[in-house]
Swiss-Prot record:
EC number: 1.-.-.-
Primary gene name: ataY
Pathway noted in the entry: Mycotoxin biosynthesis
The species this protein was found in: Aspergillus terreus (strain NIH 2624 / FGSC A1156)
Name the record gives this protein: Cytochrome P450 monooxygenase ataY
UniProt function note: Cytochrome P450 monooxygenase; part of the gene cluster that mediates the biosynthesis of acetylaranotin, a member of the epipolythiodioxopiperazine (ETP) class of toxins characterized by a disulfide-bridged cyclic dipeptide. The first step of acetylaranotin biosynthesis is performed by the NRPS ataP which produces diketopiperazine cyclo-L-Phe-L-Phe via the condensation of 2 phenylalanines (L-Phe). The ataC domain of ataTC then catalyzes the formation of bishydroxylation of cyclo-L-Phe-L-Phe.
Signal sequence region: none
Cofactor(s) the protein needs: heme
Family indicated by similarity: Belongs to the cytochrome P450 family.
InterPro entries: Cyt_P450, Cyt_P450_sf, Cytochrome_P450_monoxygenase
A Pfam family it matches: p450
Keywords: Heme, Iron, Metal-binding, Monooxygenase, Oxidoreductase
Residue numbers binding heme: 216
GO molecular function: heme binding; iron ion binding; monooxygenase activity; oxidoreductase activity, acting on paired donors, with incorporation or reduction of molecular oxygen
Gene knockout outcome: Impairs the production of acetylaranotin and accumulates chemically stable intermediates or shunt products such as haematocin B, haematocin, terrespirodione A and terrespirodione B. Also leads to the accumulation of deacetylhaematocin and demethyl-deacetylhaematocin when ataS and ataH are also deleted.
Length: 228
């Protein structure tokens, strides 16, 4: 992320090629400082102290359900649980509620469990592959499985965005994180974010909500158990 006083521009690793051909432009990947500053100002409202405190009830409800499901031998995995996966279920449910006001019920149902490996694959394509494969047009030829899974992931993200936009148009849009993006107006043009920009931001919200927090919790659990 660019800080307010950053003097250097992000490298081509983030754009995966020329800026004008960048496929994914969001808070995490944009190299344009002006664009990044605008996006950071929008999302900062969702991360203010007051906002974070307002999330407490939702987070505690999910944690209580998480503990209940873990102690039930009849839930996913039987009496022995894969804690890495279970922390992913927990954080994804929290992300869904806070970002899209949608309960994915990852802790109680397996309908959305398919998204977990798709997120892993998408992250690998962005962070674990050589950018020149994209620049030279070789990625679709050499990374067939990853590219196919990326398309599935982007379709899934588009579906979540369409669902949230439909709620807003129906006058049922709750005060969640995505509402900040839907209500944003460009100061110069007065225009709202287009679908492509909304979908790109949804990518980073979904991945950050599930992937970055879950390993932290999992690591804390391991440290605590090893300290006993």
């Amino acid at each position: 992320m660019y800080g307010p006083g950053t003097k250097f521009e992000k490298a081509m690793f983030y754009t995966r090629g020329p800026k004008e051909k960048q496929l994914l432009v969001n808070l995490a990947s944009t190299t344009d400082k002006a664009v990044h500053a605008r996006k950071r100002r929008i999302i900062s409202h969702a991360l203010s102290e007051a906002s974070i405190r307002s999330y407490e009830v939702t987070i505690l409800d999910k944690i209580q359900l998480f503990c209940k499901q873990l102690s039930d031998a009849s839930t996913f995995g039987g009496p022995y649980k894969n804690m890495s996966r279970w922390f992913s279920y927990l954080t994804y449910d929290i992300m869904g509620q806070l970002t899209f006001s949608q309960s994915y019920d990852m802790l109680t149902k397996d309908d959305h469990h398919f998204i977990q490996p798709l997120i892993d694959s998408y992250q690998h394509s962005q962070l674990g592959t050589e950018p020149k494969l994209d620049q030279w047009g070789l990625a679709p030829l050499l990374l067939l499985r990853i590219m196919a899974e990326n398309k599935k992931f982007r379709r899934y993200v588009d579906d979540q965005v369409n669902h949230r936009i439909a709620l807003e148009k129906a006058g049922q849009g709750p005060p969640d994180i995505f509402k900040l993006l839907l209500e944003h107006k460009d100061k110069e043009t007065g225009e709202s974010m287009g679908f492509k920009e909304l979908s790109d931001e949804a990518v980073v919200l979904i991945i950050a909500g599930r992937r970055f927090f879950s390993p932290c919790v999992n690591g804390s659990k391991r440290f605590t158990l090893n300290s006993q």
